[in-house]
Amino acid sequence: MVLTKRIIPCLDLKDGRVVKGTHFVDLRDAGDPVELAERYNEQGADEVVFLDITASKEQRGAILSVISRAADQLFLPLTVGGGIRTIDDIQQLLRAGADKVSINTSAIKDPSLISDGAVRFGNQCIVVAVDVRRSTAANPDATVIHLPDGTTCWYEVVIYGGSTPTGIDAVRWVQDAEERGAGEILLTSMETDGTKNGFDLAITAAVSDAVSIPVIASGGVGTLADFYDGVTAGKADACLAASVFHYGEFTVRDVKTYLAGRGVPVRL
């Protein structure tokens, strides 16, 4: 059976509201994540990611109420990330109606969160998000990655939104995460994030080769061809994007039609 490649819009939420602008002119409420997610659902999105960037723990109630509304109204898988530090946090989100949770910095700080979460809730619920940056610092144990310009580097895991280097080799970390029970890897390269120049294909392919669980490519989409490159040269199982969808440069349906026309299996 050929697995279809998934297209996943991502919405950044703060206090239960969407923070990045959106182009949909006929929305009743452009800040309502459930209404936006419904729009993506209609366009054929395979799932939606809500990334909660609310700083404080006190405001977690907002995201929980959004999730329960979304779970009631949407019939597509919902992944929620941001601020998840404990098994109790995971349980609250899943109980509210999330299908999966995405853990990032907390997984590096406490890798047992991956294994405990996988045992308690199932591997399929645990997405490990990995933010990476290129490094040429001496690291004899790191996985050497060959870049398109002929140079080499290794990729370092960065945490706290990309601001803090860890010294950890990205390829080793994703293998470790898989061994601990992660069901999926959400990979964002800080080299390409926000550039609209396409995914960082070198590390995406290296990570996809290094693990047997699905890899979601994130960071850098600007054109329809970038999605194609992500699932072919990048070997990713899914592509995540935010601004190109929010600002209406193209729809999820446009992406899938483009991919299908080039022989990529997608759910239309």
From Swiss-Prot:
InterPro entries: Aldolase_TIM, His_biosynth, HisF, IGPS_HisA/HisF, RibuloseP-bd_barrel. The keyword DNA repair does not apply. GO terms for biological process: L-histidine biosynthetic process. Its main location: cytoplasm. It comes from the Archaea. Pathway: Amino-acid biosynthesis; L-histidine biosynthesis; L-histidine from 5-phospho-alpha-D-ribose 1-diphosphate: step 5/9. The active site is at D12, D131. Its EC number is 4.3.2.10. It is an enzyme of class 4 (lyase). It is found in: Cytoplasm. Gene3D superfamilies: Aldolase class I. One of its GO terms (molecular function) is lyase activity. It catalyses: 5-[(5-phospho-1-deoxy-D-ribulos-1-ylimino)methylamino]-1-(5-phospho-beta-D-ribosyl)imidazole-4-carboxamide + L-glutamine = D-erythro-1-(imidazol-4-yl)glycerol 3-phosphate + 5-amino-1-(5-phospho-beta-D-ribosyl)imidazole-4-carboxamide + L-glutamate + H(+). The keyword Amino-acid biosynthesis applies. IGPS catalyzes the conversion of PRFAR and glutamine to IGP, AICAR and glutamate. The HisF subunit catalyzes the cyclization activity that produces IGP and AICAR from PRFAR using the ammonia provided by the HisH subunit. Heterodimer of HisH and HisF. Belongs to the HisA/HisF family. This is Imidazole glycerol phosphate synthase subunit HisF. It comes from Methanosphaerula palustris (strain ATCC BAA-1556 / DSM 19958 / E1-9c).
